[in-house]
């Protein structure tokens, strides 16, 4: 515990523990600009720590900034299992560095506490502000490999999205333009046919483990995707299985959530793990086809497919989806003892990194 004097208030930094969940969830829900409820935050804490297969009692959840007995700031982290070469290690995923305005001068003191822990781990920061980016890049963080600065998408209800970029005087043309976009997408898209079948069902743990073990040695640096990890990542998301006959050949995680800006639901492609024997074109075509059908049946306005790698980028472009700019702010810091074996070509990152898709 570290005590600091501010005027007549005693400010301290201490470790976060389970007894703090209630007060911290309320602090987060009431923090300026936050859109989650107290219950949402309690569920996040349980997911990050209590239900996390990589978490144990040795892991420090984070640190609180306390003034006169009340939480005025905090910073957190949670672990995930990560494959680094031949080793399975814990990765450090930083989250939620936030401090109330009157106490901002202690922000660096608070962040430094987390930094002291994270320097021994592979460490991710996936939701940094511009100021945070300037700071973490000085500490050795770099953008992790990605498939360029575009993402593919498919609009099922284009009207709200068009409305945002058109002047008011053009809004009478929205129905016509929306119809044109829908027809244009249908004419442009090229989905290859295959014998793959897709299911939104619970998958047998042994099948997931077999898929992971068959393919894990193709990539040096990536998230562990055994059954425990996948089921944790997929909590409150859609877990999609891809079969060729009776054999599980791919799994994908999809995230359905409301986009408050457009007041519409969107389905985002969060992760995909594919058997090396199956073409990525066949798998992505099947997934896109499934997502379009699912969206029509569940009032989803837009499908989003981030480009996890150059291979995903090239394949999604060949499929013919529309694309737009997507500057994914994912940063990683590799400890010195692992740097020699880390290359862009040997790595595979998705939206499972940090707290972005978790």
Regions found by a protein language model. Name each.
Residues 1-19, 177-204:
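Conserved N-terminal entry element of GNAT/NAT acetyltransferase domains
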Residues 2-5, 121-186, 253-281, 285-358:
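Active-site/acyl-donor-binding loops of N-acyltransferases
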Residues 13-92, 96-97, 199-274:
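A conserved beta-strand-loop-helix scaffold within acyl/acetyltransferase catalytic domains
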Residues 88-92, 108-114:
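"Short basic amphipathic alpha-helical interaction patches in structured regions
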Residues 98-109, 275-285:
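Conserved glycine-rich acetyl-CoA-binding loop
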Residues 110-113, 229, 287-290:
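Short, hydrophobic/aromatic alpha-helical segments in well-folded domains
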Residues 111-115, 121-124:
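A generic, well-ordered mixed alpha/beta core segment in the N-terminal half of proteins
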């Amino acid at each position: 515990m570290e005590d600091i004097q501010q005027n007549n208030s005693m400010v301290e930094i201490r470790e976060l523990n389970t007894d703090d969940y209630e007060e911290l969830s309320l602090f987060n829900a009431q923090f300026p600009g936050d859109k989650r409820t107290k219950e949402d935050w309690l569920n996040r804490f349980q997911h990050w720590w209590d239900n996390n297969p990589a978490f144990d009692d040795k892991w420090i959840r984070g640190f609180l900034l306390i003034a006169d007995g009340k939480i005025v700031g905090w910073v957190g982290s949670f672990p995930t299992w990560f494959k680094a070469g031949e080793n399975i290690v814990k990765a450090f995923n930083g989250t939620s560095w936030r401090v109330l305005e009157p106490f901002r001068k202690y922000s660096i003191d608070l962040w430094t506490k987390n930094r002291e822990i994270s320097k021994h781990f592979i460490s991710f920061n996936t939701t940094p502000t511009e100021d945070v980016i300037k700071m973490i890049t000085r500490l050795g963080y770099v953008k992790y490999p990605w498939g360029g600065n575009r993402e593919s998408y498919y609009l099922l209800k284009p009207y709200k999205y068009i409305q945002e970029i058109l002047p008011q005087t053009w809004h009478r043309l929205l129905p016509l333009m929306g119809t044109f976009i829908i027809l244009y997408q249908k004419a442009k898209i090229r989905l290859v046919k295959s014998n793959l079948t897709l299911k939104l069902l619970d998958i047998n743990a042994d099948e997931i483990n077999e898929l992971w073990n068959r393919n894990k040695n193709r990539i040096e640096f990536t998230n562990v995707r055994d059954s425990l990890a996948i089921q944790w990542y997929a909590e409150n998301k859609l877990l999609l299985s891809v079969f060729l006959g009776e054999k599980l050949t791919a799994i994908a995680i999809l995230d359905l959530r409301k986009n408050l800006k457009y007041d519409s639901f969107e389905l985002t492609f969060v992760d995909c793990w594919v058997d090396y024997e199956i073409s990525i074109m066949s798998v992505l075509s099947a997934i896109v086809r499934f997502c379009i059908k699912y969206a029509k049946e569940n009032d989803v306005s837009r499908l989003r497919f981030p480009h996890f790698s150059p291979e995903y980028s090239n394949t999604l472009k060949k499929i013919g989806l529309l694309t737009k700019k997507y500057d994914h702010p994912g940063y990683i810091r590799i400890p010195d003892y692992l740097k020699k074996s880390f290359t862009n070509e040997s790595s595979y990152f998705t939206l499972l990194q940090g707290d972005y898709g978790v």
